[in-house]
Amino acid sequence: MTDNDGQKDFSEAAAENAGSKPGEPRVSKPYIMPDDPEETPSEALVKEAAEAKDRMLRTLAEMENLRKRTQREVADARAYGIAGFARDVLEIADNLQRALDAVPAEARAAADPGLTALIEGVELTERSLHRALEKNGVKKLDAAGEKFDPNIHQAMFEVPDNSVPPGTVVQVIQTGYMIGDRVLRPALVGVSKAEPKPAA
């Protein structure tokens, strides 16, 4: 047995132990870092404090949004809470106006004192009712002569009329009303349209 044989035996043994063939270089396994190294207690506290601050800021933002929404709802309730009642009262105003319109002008001029007092009483009641409505934010729409607006007017018919621009309200059938900036009841109107030109 020579020294070369000893060296050969030693290298063969080392190769077998390493699981590789003789003459191949030996490769060691790389060190792999753990995926989630353990946090130190101070890092955990900092992370927990940041999460708590984030939750607190979100809660404060939600509370502020809730406060603003509640204020809007309260303001709307104050402004529009009487809408249903006001709509019912408008029928009374319409009936008072119909009663006044039912008396012809000639009958008013030649009326006896009893009829004159009745007409004045109905007019006074109508004015009083409109004042009460205005006091509560309900305003009358004066539609006659205005440009037709589908947001506040409801067209019932068209009237051929070249004396005004097409799309102008020429007749009001039923008065419209607003409550705040909302339409309580649209005005029922007749709208002008251009008269057809005669055929030549």
From Swiss-Prot:
MF terms (GO), sorted A to Z: adenyl-nucleotide exchange factor activity; protein homodimerization activity; protein-folding chaperone binding; unfolded protein binding
UniProt record, GO biological process: protein folding
Presence of keyword Chaperone: yes
Basic and acidic residues biased stretches: 1-11
Keywords, comma-separated and alphabetical: Chaperone, Cytoplasm, Stress response
InterPro entries: GrpE, GrpE_coiled_coil, GrpE_head
Main location: cytoplasm
Domain of life: Bacteria
One Pfam family linked to the record: GrpE
Region spans: Disordered: 1-43
Similarity remark: Belongs to the GrpE family.
Binding partners and assembly: Homodimer.
Function, as annotated: Participates actively in the response to hyperosmotic and heat shock by preventing the aggregation of stress-denatured proteins, in association with DnaK and GrpE. It is the nucleotide exchange factor for DnaK and may function as a thermosensor. Unfolded proteins bind initially to DnaJ; upon interaction with the DnaJ-bound protein, DnaK hydrolyzes its bound ATP, resulting in the formation of a stable complex. GrpE releases ADP from DnaK; ATP binding to DnaK triggers the release of the substrate protein, thus completing the reaction cycle.
Name of the protein in its database record: Protein GrpE
Species whose genome carries this gene: Afipia carboxidovorans (strain ATCC 49405 / DSM 1227 / KCTC 32145 / OM5)
